């Protein structure tokens, strides 16, 4: 339980770096830069990253795992694609290639990716998934009731990131990103204490805004669960746990540097997690986006379009669920 709580704080802080509502001038300037890139008619992107996990056993032994990943992508208005590969230098893990396409509100991912992920833990892919004859599975986010078009349009507004942050954390949340601005370069440097404090504020704000999140994103959370999460986040026990979490993350650093020009954007992200009684997790990632000319995207033709609910049923181990032809759109 202690480890789960620690990792929850880590992930919340990392995600908050990209989505938090802010009010400082540096944050507002950063939001303006993001909105400018969102207005590009077309964007070519690339990602290169390296994840290293070192787990220390109670007997002094160490288990190491490294995963390298790289991706290329292209976006033009509401259409995009990305091709992502994963490499294990030690050859222990065989993570499948991810090929994803987005056409408006529908996102398609290659079926072989889902099958390969299922086999990583030694299990066979769900029968319902294997029974699909099409090569790509598309999930229609519009069917969930979430206005994806509205969310995308929001990001083109000068204060789009700030407004999106308010949507997640609430309009009265006392949150801001600790940006240091130097011209068009924005850096963030967090240690263990700053990481935990930032994550704690974000978790509390999110919990107190769950009613709005539940309705906006159609999460389907029952009222009882929302009440329980609000109570937990605002309890004295929550605040009392923070010093212990800070101590367990002593030595941790999270750093990011983002640079904007009129025609491109680059980001360097480094996360060095030092977790007491566990080990280390180090993630480095470099991202580049370049303003590009508009070109057509060739979408896969062997596709099956389903709702999120139908997809969830397909992924249940041992299920033999099939999708009725009348509930989806198939092209081949």
Predicted regions and their residues:
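Bacterial N-terminal signal peptides that target proteins for export
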Residues: 1-10
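C-terminal motif of bacterial Sec signal peptides marking the signal peptidase cleavage site
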Residues: 18-22
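Subset-of-secretome marker
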Residues: 24-332
